[in-house]
């Protein structure tokens, strides 16, 4: 059986519970949903940073699976999950909460639970950052193309999450109960 993914309280991550995903590095911050470009529904997945215009608490997420699993309600390393923002939204935008990676390799919302191309996995790292253990990296896994690390880029002046080719390039993340 694969090991469980743990939050910063040392508790296993559970399907359907709310978490903040945070970069524990100095200057890093929590992941949040933002509207870039006056869209009807916000769809950009960004990371707060320690600079005034990007400070913030983050948008909670829940992890979901497309079907019941032998793993029960616990999230385990390197098993496929869908990541979904948890927030009050209009009926119009209710389908715009699941993460996916777009053609520019940016993490955005608008994915679908059940779509094999919108699966993410969580992998343990050996990093201990500012006293935080349980540090992980996120991977985006398209059905037959393998997985890519989730790193960052500054697309159009925004700190975006993005799928990256370089195996050494990734943003470390910790999970905090929301």
Curated annotation (Swiss-Prot):
**GO CC annotations on file:** vacuole
Subcellular localization is given as:
Vacuole
The keyword Nucleotide-binding is assigned to this record: no
Annotated signal sequence is: none
**GO MF term (any one):** cysteine-type endopeptidase inhibitor activity
Does Disulfide bond count among this protein's keywords? Answer: yes
Q: What is its main location?
A: other
Q: Which UniProt keywords apply?
A: Disulfide bond, Protease inhibitor, Thiol protease inhibitor, Vacuole
Disulfide bonds, paired cysteine numbers? 41-93, 141-147
Q: Which domain of life is it from?
A: Eukaryota
Which Pfam families does the entry link to?
Kunitz_legume
Spell out the family assignment given in the record's similarity comment: Belongs to the protease inhibitor I3 (leguminous Kunitz-type inhibitor) family.
Q: What's this protein's function? A: Inhibitor of cysteine proteases. May protect the plant by inhibiting proteases of invading organisms.
Question: What name is this protein filed under?
Answer: Cysteine protease inhibitor 7
């Amino acid at each position: 059986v694969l090991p469980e993914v743990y939050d910063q309280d040392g508790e296993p991550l559970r399907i359907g519970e709310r978490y903040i995903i945070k970069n524990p590095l100095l200057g890093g911050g929590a992941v949040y949903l933002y509207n870039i470009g006056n869209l009807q529904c916000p769809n950009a997945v960004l990371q707060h940073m320690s600079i005034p215009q990007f400070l913030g608490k983050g948008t909670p997420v829940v992890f979901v699976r497309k079907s019941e699993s032998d793993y029960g309600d616990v999230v385990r390393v390197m098993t496929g999950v869908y990541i979904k923002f948890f927030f009050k939204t209009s009926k119009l935008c209710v389908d715009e909460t699941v993460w996916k990676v777009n053609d520019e390799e940016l993490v955005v919302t608008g994915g679908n639970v059940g779509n094999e191309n919108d699966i993410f996995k969580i992998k343990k790292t050996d990093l201990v950052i500012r006293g935080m253990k349980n540090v992980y990296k996120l991977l985006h896994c398209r059905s037959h193309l393998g997985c890519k690390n989730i790193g960052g880029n500054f697309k159009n002046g925004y700190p975006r999450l993005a799928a990256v080719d370089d195996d050494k390039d990734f943003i470390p993340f910790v999970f905090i109960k929301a």
